[in-house]
Regions:
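Signature of Gram-negative outer-membrane beta-barrel scaffolds
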Residues: 1-48, 52, 63, 179
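Outer-membrane beta-barrel translocator domains and adjoining extracellular loop/strand segments
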Residues: 4-13, 66-74, 79, 121-129, ...
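Extracellular loop and loop/strand-boundary signature of outer-membrane beta-barrel proteins
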Residues: 22-30, 78-84, 98, 135-141, ...
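Residues that define the transmembrane beta-barrel architecture of outer-membrane proteins
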Residues: 33-37, 90-94, 144-148, 157-159
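Gram-negative outer-membrane beta-barrel transporters
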Residues: 114-117, 136-183
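Membrane-embedded beta-barrel scaffold of Gram-negative outer-membrane proteins
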Residues: 46, 52-58, 64, 68, ...
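Residue-level signature of outer-membrane beta-barrel architecture
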Residues: 35, 43-45, 59, 88, ...
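Feature marks flexible
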Residues: 12-28, 58-60, 112, 126, ...
Length: 183
């Protein structure tokens, strides 16, 4: 449908006083094009019939964002597509896992670690107002992040008693740097 898009002064925070222009787009007109290859590589090496190592690498892009304001109770999420002011989120992930079967495959033990680097992650400014806000880019910050962790899993796959026991340690860190005190 029809849309309008604001442009803001370079090197300034996005707010009412830094609006340079408002561009109108007709239905079906392209506002901004983003793209990129999403590569996925994986490998498995079987050292013995009951021991293997698996590794994977991938990258991804997120062009559509869910904006959920967690500071107030509301069942409404706002959806925002990447545009002139909000870049798509990018992620790069690597993982490495070791898998071992015991007692003729009755038990399986696995240990897997991962690391993920993220760019242009969205977060809200303090006191952000998203409800019926046509210019949500004024309420959003974009930054970088990383996540890493390790997962342990022990499975008992057969017999009268079966199930699994697992433990995951993970950590996510984000940085939203701005040279402007209002952000």
């Amino acid at each position: 449908g029809k849309a309008t898009q604001r442009t803001y002064e370079d090197g300034m925070p996005k707010n009412e006083s830094t609006v340079q222009d408002t561009i109108s787009y007709s239905s079906g007109e392209n506002i901004k094009t983003y793209g990129g290859p999403e590569v996925r590589l994986s490998a498995r090496y079987l050292f013995t019939p009951d021991f293997s190592v698996k590794a994977s690498l991938n990258n991804s892009y997120q062009f559509l964002h869910t904006l959920s304001n967690n500071t107030t109770v509301s069942p409404i999420d706002t959806w925002k597509i990447s545009d002139l002011n909000i870049a798509p989120q990018k992620g790069y992930q690597a993982s490495l896992g070791f898998y071992k079967n015991f007692k003729e495959n009755e038990y399986e033990l696995s240990i897997e670690g991962y690391y993920k680097k993220m760019e242009d992650v969205l977060d809200f400014k303090t006191g952000a107002n998203l409800f019926l806000n046509e210019n949500v880019e004024t309420q959003i910050l974009q930054g970088d992040g990383k996540a890493y962790g390790v997962e342990f899993l022990l499975k008992k796959k057969s017999g009268d008693l079966n199930g699994w026991l697992s433990y995951t340690y993970s950590r996510s860190l984000y940085r939203f740097d701005s040279e402007f005190s209002e952000e």
